[in-house]
Amino acid sequence: MKDTIRQLIQQALTRLVTEGVLPEGLTPAIQVENARDKTHGDFASNIAMMLAKPAGMKPRDLAEKLIAALPADQQISKVEIAGPGFLNFFQNTAALAARLDAALADPEKLSVRKAGAAQRVVVDLSAPNLAKEMHVGHLRSTIIGDGVANVLEFLGDTVIRQNHVGDWGTQFGMLLAYLQEKPATSDELSDLENFYRAAKQRFDESEEFAERARGLVVKLQAGDAECLALWTRFKDISLSHCQETYERLNVKLTPADVMGESAYNDDLANVVNDLKATGLLVESNGAQCVFLEEFRTADDTPLPVIVQKAGGGYLYATTDLAAIRYRSKVLKADRVLYFVDQRQALHFQQVFEVARRAGFVHDGMQLEHMGFGTMNGADGRPFKTRDGGTVKLIDLLDEAEERAYTLVREKNPEVAEAELRSIAKAVGISAVKYADLSKHRASDYSFNFDQMLSFEGNTAPYLLYAYTRVAGVFRKLGSAFDASKGQIVLAAPQEQELAARLAQFTETLNNVAEKGTPHVLCAYLYDLAGLFSSFYENCPILGAENPDQQQSRLRLAALTGRTLKQGLDLLGLETLERM
C-alpha cells in the first residue's frame, strides 16, 4: 500500500511541475509512514513540508494543491491535511477487505510478492570452527541468517546457503598430532571440546609436540594422504555434531551447504597472483599487501589488507577474496549477505573494496555485511559459564527445554508425558531463538531465561499461544482455516485495525529481505497477535449476530492464523495446535 501511495504522490508532483507550481529537477525521497492514530488515517506523508520551501509556499497550501492533483484510486477513500501540512491517507475498507479475501485464496503465498525482480542471493551464515563444538557465539549468525534466507526464498529469490566453516589452519596440525599420539574412537571424539583442550595442553607443554604439529600442517597443506585421512575423519565427526544442532534449532542448513575454508585452498595462490597482475599488490616487510587510501589507522598511516605473510602463508582475507570470486563467477550471485559479528566490519569493508578493484565481482553484484552484536549474560558481559568458559550451544538448548518442560508441566499436569516433552521442545527452542531474533541484529542483548520463557510480552511462548488461540476457534467449530465462506466485511474498529495490519505482511517481509532484520517480522507478529486479541474480545465470532458476520470474522481469524503460522515458520519457529 505504501508503494501505491508513493506512486500517487509522484504522479501528483509531476502534474504540479507541469503546471508550474513546483520547479523542475526535484527528486525528493517520498516518505510514507504508518499513521500512529488511526482516527487520522492509515498512512501519512510529510512531502508537502519537504517541498514547501522550493515551491515558495506554505506547507498547508502546497498540501491542498497536492491533494487536488492526486489521481483517484479505489484503494484510498479520502486524503486529509493534518497539523502543519501532513497528508493523511485513509484506506477504502471495501478494497482492503477484497485484498484480504485474495490473500486467503492464496494459501501458499498469502498474496505476498517481492518488491522488485527476483535475485540469486548467497547467504553466508553460521560458519563454526570445526576444531571445537558449536558454542553460544554461533547462535546469532546461524538463526539470523537462516531467518533472512527463509524470507528471501519465500519472496521468490534463489537462495544459496553457504556455511563457510573453519576447517583449515594451524590448529588442525595440533589436533592431528594428538590424534596420532592417542588414536581416538568415535565416541572419544564426540566430546570435541575436551579433545581440543587436551591437544592444546600438549601443544603448550611440549615443544617436541608443537614442532610435530607444525610439521603436520605443512604435510596437510601439501596433500599428504595420511594427514588428509585423519583430517577428513575429524572434520566429518565435527560436521555431524553441527548438523545435529542445526536440526534441533530447526535451521535449514545441510551438509550440502558446507563450503569451508579448505574449499578455496587451490585458488589462494591465484588470488595473490591476480592481485599482483592488477597492480594492487605491494610488498611490506616481506608480506604481500593491498593498501587502500580510504583505510587508515588512528595516526593516519595506511591500513593494509595482508593477503600473504612473509613466510608464504595465507590469511582470512585471502580466503574471503577467493570465496567472493567463486560466488561471483561460479554461483553467479546478484547479492551476497555475510552474517558475521559486527566486530568484523572493517575487515569486510576492506575485503569488499579489494574485490571490486581487482575485478573479482561482476557489475551490480552487492556485497553486504549483516553484522550483529553480542549475546551477553545478566552482568552485561559476553555469555560464559560460571568458571568463565564458553557455553556449548547444545547445553544451552538442553537447559531451555528442561525449563520449558517444568513450566508446561505446571500449567498442564494432566497432559501425557510424551506430549509434554514435545511441547517443551517447541517452546524451549523457540524461546531461545525468538529472544535473539526479536532484537535488532546490530544490538547487544542480555540472555535471560525467565524473560524469554514468559507468556507475557514479546516472547515466543506468547506468540505460540496466540496461534493456538486462533486454531482453537476452528477446533471448536470442527473446521479448518480454509472452511470459511463468504466475504470479509470490515465494520467494527477492531476488525479494521486487524485487517490493516494483515495487509502489511508483504511490506514487512520485503523490509526484512532488504535490510536483513528479522526483528521487524517479530515486531509485526507481536503487534498482529495483540490486535487479534482485541478483535477476539470485542467482535464475537461464535456468538456473531448473523451467519454472514460470523463467516466474515472467521475469515479474518483464518488469515490471522495463516499469517502467524507463516511468519513463525519463516523465523524457524515450530507452531503448536495446543499448549
UniProtKB/Swiss-Prot annotation:
InterPro entries linked to this entry: aa-tRNA-synth_I_CS, Arg-tRNA-ligase, Arg-tRNA-synth_N, Arg-tRNA-synth_N_sf, ArgRS_core, DALR_anticod-bd, Rossmann-like_a/b/a_fold, tRNAsynth_Ia_anticodon-bd
Enzyme Commission number(s): 6.1.1.19
Molecular functions (GO terms): arginine-tRNA ligase activity; ATP binding
Keyword set includes Oxidoreductase: no
One Gene Ontology cellular component annotation held by this UniProt entry: cytoplasm
Origin superkingdom: Bacteria
UniProt entry keywords in alphabetical sequence: Aminoacyl-tRNA synthetase, ATP-binding, Cytoplasm, Ligase, Nucleotide-binding, Protein biosynthesis
Primary subcellular site in the record, as a coarse category: cytoplasm
Locus of motif 'HIGH' region: 128-138
Transcription regulation found in the keyword field: no
Biological process, per Gene Ontology: arginyl-tRNA aminoacylation
HAMAP family: Arg_tRNA_synth
Annotated family: Belongs to the class-I aminoacyl-tRNA synthetase family.
Record note on quaternary structure: Monomer.
Protein name per its UniProtKB record: Arginine--tRNA ligase
Organism: Pseudomonas syringae pv. syringae (strain B728a)
Native organism taxonomy: Bacteria, Pseudomonadati, Pseudomonadota, Gammaproteobacteria, Pseudomonadales
Gene this protein is translated from: argS
